[in-house]
């Protein structure tokens, strides 16, 4: 080890250990008498690795790189349970394997340390979230270190550390200072857009922007008939604040009024997936719809690129399909319907409703229109007679999340009293509102074709609305016709055509009549980037003269506040801070929202490459060397949000020339969950009386989770339960006949909220980290869900103990450890090398453990002494799974340096050829016995031996042999 750098060269520095403590021996170890003292072994090697900086890594252009990354954890107060390390163990196995294969491996770890749980605790206790977060991180770090992971801890990052979020703020600032060129398909500096406006206005500018952005301007500069086009003279005549407002509509990070899920109890905006049945998933608090001024991210500009580059990624089809569904690209037409009176004549307002449809060929079948309750034109359509009903319905819809509205099959809606003019028939089309139409998808309005859409058909039947039949020979009495091969009827020139034939004609007609355009629509919406929370990244934004300005000269850190709740006016917690409470203050006011939880996690994989750089987020030469993450391992719950945002930010940074690749994760594995066995008690509704499991159906009961540590073989510790839940200290329990209370049970997700978690700490203390590592891999395929069961862990522990004993006996051989082993032993080892290598290349982590068990059993059963040529390769094979024990075994064989730096062994073909083959011998297709024969025998020789075997004569029972079929190396079939 170089004392000045702390870097470690395993091959060079481990010789110091050997020289100091005896050739071929670890520090002070007598292998001849050693048992498997896993506590001493693991403590020793963890200390050795740490002292020597064994896992520190630097760029090395002479070696190929490999980047293995885990989805970093949120450090909760509960610490790790046994489900958390599953992916970490798999990534560690793979990282060690690649190191053995000669790669320069980057394998870092950090913490996604901003988050709501720490803030909720701060609200309850008044303790600053930074304190609890740091305490939780220390606990996580200790748990991770005891498992022997090869993380380069010198690269640790924390998203809540100002030295980290300084660069999150910088990336946001770059997004704020950029626009998206839809023609060149790239992000460009906003200054270039300003220059273009100054030279030519916005003519020939191809920029992603807010739809109808000019309708939202707060200044009357252009007049009521402005269509969004302006000249250079117009631009130059604008004031600075007016230019700022126009530019905001084109920035990639921008301010806009947005309808959000607002949770008053939590005091923040929630994402759609954080709301269920109108309640927050965390805490079950009511959630309502609310329009707020929010920071947004123009991810929609990247929608097509996010779709197109999926094909080049080594991800599962299910993950790619989830991304495609979330982005939701569809081709069709935008059609405009003019506001009209009840006779279909334009009402003179000039207002139009734009709808998107993928089936413009069904335009003849439109019999009503449905708007989302939040659509901005609802108020203008609503008649006085309908206003009360419309307002009541809007209020009801505001209490539902988009997910609830999409999943609710109940039919509901209200007629507004207004109409639009049908562009084809010129007739009046009634306008309704219904919560199955979402403001955030498409235009927030649909043209309803009940003959061709099942949802529209049910709505029309429920409210007795017309269902014009536009299909030839189709009965609509029971359902709509959704067959795209159906023939159109009563559709003018489109009659007699299928959808495929009619859609191009419909698109041509719509554009010729100037009532719409060909359009590509995406389900994905621009992402809300504001949160009304304290514990998040503050924005590097100040306000002056009514305009938002980027702060570039310093990091904006969180101010002191007197409470972590929103203000009485509903302002974010940061609004509580006075000017003197802010470490940094610029302008007239500071932005008081904070960034969402996904901000810091959208680029952390880049910071690992250069974590201590104070002048840039990552030096280009470092990102060029490490490049994309080669293998990313994490839960499937992140297959949409996190991956989309990370891909979006990566493409943006690529566009602006900061990195040389536009996809962050080349390969990815989503590990399955380790499931826990939950226990339940049954309370009679509205009482403090509990009934045992067998009596639960005789009463109206509520099932409650109970801590599994209070349950033994389904029997509940009643005293322990009363102490755990003091509110039930005086509860009555109706017991089984034998006086026990039996709980119910169910296998489900292991989580703190289900009270079914098992700590890895207890298992490490009892069996050791190597045993836990091997056991979690042994449970089953990494990608599958698996119930947690410790019944098999002792078997894995015994396997490691047996391995240790085998090496101990070999080291105690008279005359020392032989250099060579028997041919039989080498066959066993090289068969294991071939199997383990193939399994690791296929990420079949579980079957490696089985292969190693078989090898150790076969080697232990042999009578010949084992030598270095068998034991050293076996120690290397074991190293990714049981690194502590493998180091010990490697030292016992006088291995050079550290086992982790040993070259991965190659299976020698000569030892993979079997010298004996087991032939099943069948008679007329039925196997009757087996024969062990030399692998070198020719088919004719095999046939002769079978014919002469006395068991063949017994099977013939006097019959003659018609022929003998020998499949070399496989089977013999005697045909009688």
Residues of each region from the PLM?
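Conserved oxyanion/phosphate-binding beta-strand-loop segments in alpha/beta enzyme cores
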Residues: 31-69, 99-108, 132-138, 312-315, ...
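N-terminal catalytic cores of NTP/NDP-binding nucleotidyl/phosphoryl-transfer enzymes
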Residues: 58-133, 157-168, 357-358, 362, ...
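Long, charged, mostly alpha-helical binding arms that flank functional sites
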Residues: 36, 329-334, 472-508, 512-519, ...
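Residue patterns forming the tRNA-binding/recognition surfaces of aminoacyl-tRNA synthetases
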Residues: 35, 48-52, 125-353, 360, ...
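Basic, alpha-helical terminal appendages of large translation-related enzymes
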Residues: 2-3, 13-65, 360, 372-375, ...
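Catalytic alpha/beta core of large soluble enzyme barrels
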Residues: 91-92, 104, 345, 375-475, ...
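Amphipathic alpha-helical
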Residues: 296-330, 372-414, 557-582, 874-903
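Helix-rich, typically C-terminal accessory recognition domains appended to large enzymatic cores
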Residues: 183, 187-188, 249, 254-261, ...
